[in-house]
Amino acid sequence: MKLLVFGISYKTAPISLRERVIFSPENINIALNNLLKKSDILGGVILSTCNRTEVYLSIKNFYKAKKIIILWLYKFFNDLKIKEIKNNFYSYIDNYAVSHLMRVTSGLDSMILGEHQILSQVKSAFFRSLKNKNISIDLQKLFESAFSVAKKIRSETKIGSYSISIPYIICVLLKKIFISFTEIKVMLIGSGTINELIAKQLFKYKIKDLFISNRTIDHAKNLAIKVNGCVVEFNEIFKNLNKMQVIITSTYSRKLIITYKIIKSIIEKNKNKKIIFIDISIPRNIDKKIKKITGVHLYTLEDLKDLITNNLEKRKNAATLAENIIKKESIKFMSHIKGYYSSEIIKKYRFQINKLKKIYEKKALLELKLGNNPENIIKKLTYKLTNRLVHKPTKLLYNTSCSKNNKDLYDLYNKLKIDL
């Protein structure tokens, strides 16, 4: 048996092609069952996400299996051409397949280096195949090993600790400034995707008070419900600024929302007031001149980028350590699986010999019951059993002798000979 990965990812194909090769929850089992009808395919797992579609298989022959998979994909996805499959799909066999799965589950092959969401996606794919009895023992061992390696990498390299998402970086920044999140009030201006992610991250950190403001009041209300926040009407923003410790803006406004003049006025009325402004809008929503005001600190995307770059470097260093772990673990797995196959073959061989022994033993016991001569029975038993056991080795020796290479013949003899 061999292990094979056949797939497509963001590295090898544009989204216009990837979106045509996505298995839905409704058709994924049907697709895999169709593939497993082929005698050369012994087991399989389909992983289908927005960034990759991969088929992990246990197979008999690489070249036959590859032809089967290409034809299977072509038939299953009506608008997919054979040429597109050959030009954009990759394949990995045995130890390369093992290393690839370990890299995928550990987030090393992800668009965002080290992201952990892929691990749960791979687990879902594995358990789906396990539930439907579509998985072979070698594939099961491979996936279980990959999950163990992913856990080891996260534990030993801390690759997941160095987040590079803006919401997380903002929280890291605020943690450096404030002792506790439970004592600060934050206002988010804008309720788009990025501010929603920031709001959810702040909610996880148990922020004391979270205020949401947006030009469309319903959008602000919807987000506030999700994070247990309060709504501030857009035209009421400036009345509430003096109550806040942190203001984060992310809107599509092409004009400045927070000006130097407004903030100067607020600070003059509230002596010793300190406010943190974080502007992640493009174009910027906050006048950069407010940095000149005592007690005011402004952070923009450029400032956050430095933190992101720093964390990305840490991730890359962690990834190097992770690659070393995978190299060792993939070798260990291949050694283990080869040992497993060997032991299974040996068990099978010994079972056959034992079965043969029982057949002749049964015949001999029957003859003894009939009162036949015991000495003749034993001679007959050993003669027949010996002939059966040495038939194939003798044939092998004869065929080797016909090759006119005496060294091969003597090497084989030395391997087959019985030590007395």
Curated annotation (Swiss-Prot):
Pathway the protein takes part in: Porphyrin-containing compound metabolism; protoporphyrin-IX biosynthesis; 5-aminolevulinate from L-glutamyl-tRNA(Glu): step 1/2
Site feature: Important for activity: 100
GO molecular function, one term: glutamyl-tRNA reductase activity
Stored PROSITE patterns: GLUTR
Amino-acid positions noted as binding substrate in the UniProt annotation, renumbered to this chain: 49-52, 110, 115-117, 121
Active site feature: 50 (nucleophile)
Positions bound to NADP(+): 190-195
Enzyme kind, highest EC tier: oxidoreductase
Cited InterPro entries: 4pyrrol_synth_GluRdtase, 4pyrrol_synth_GluRdtase_dimer, 4pyrrol_synth_GluRdtase_N, GluRdtase_CS, GluRdtase_dimer_dom_sf, GluRdtase_N_sf, NAD(P)-bd_dom_sf, Shikm_DH/Glu-tRNA_Rdtase
Recorded catalytic activity of this chain's protein: (S)-4-amino-5-oxopentanoate + tRNA(Glu) + NADP(+) = L-glutamyl-tRNA(Glu) + NADPH + H(+)
UniProt keyword list: NADP, Oxidoreductase, Porphyrin biosynthesis
One GO term (biological process): protoporphyrinogen IX biosynthetic process from glutamate
UniProt EC number: 1.2.1.70
Subunit structure: Homodimer.
Family: Belongs to the glutamyl-tRNA reductase family.
Domain notes: Possesses an unusual extended V-shaped dimeric structure with each monomer consisting of three distinct domains arranged along a curved 'spinal' alpha-helix. The N-terminal catalytic domain specifically recognizes the glutamate moiety of the substrate. The second domain is the NADPH-binding domain, and the third C-terminal domain is responsible for dimerization.
Function as written in the Swiss-Prot or TrEMBL entry: Catalyzes the NADPH-dependent reduction of glutamyl-tRNA(Glu) to glutamate 1-semialdehyde (GSA).
Database matches in NCBIfam families: hemA (TIGR01035)
Additional information: During catalysis, the active site Cys acts as a nucleophile attacking the alpha-carbonyl group of tRNA-bound glutamate with the formation of a thioester intermediate between enzyme and glutamate, and the concomitant release of tRNA(Glu). The thioester intermediate is finally reduced by direct hydride transfer from NADPH, to form the product GSA.
Name of the protein in its database record: Glutamyl-tRNA reductase
Organism for this UniProt entry: Wigglesworthia glossinidia brevipalpis
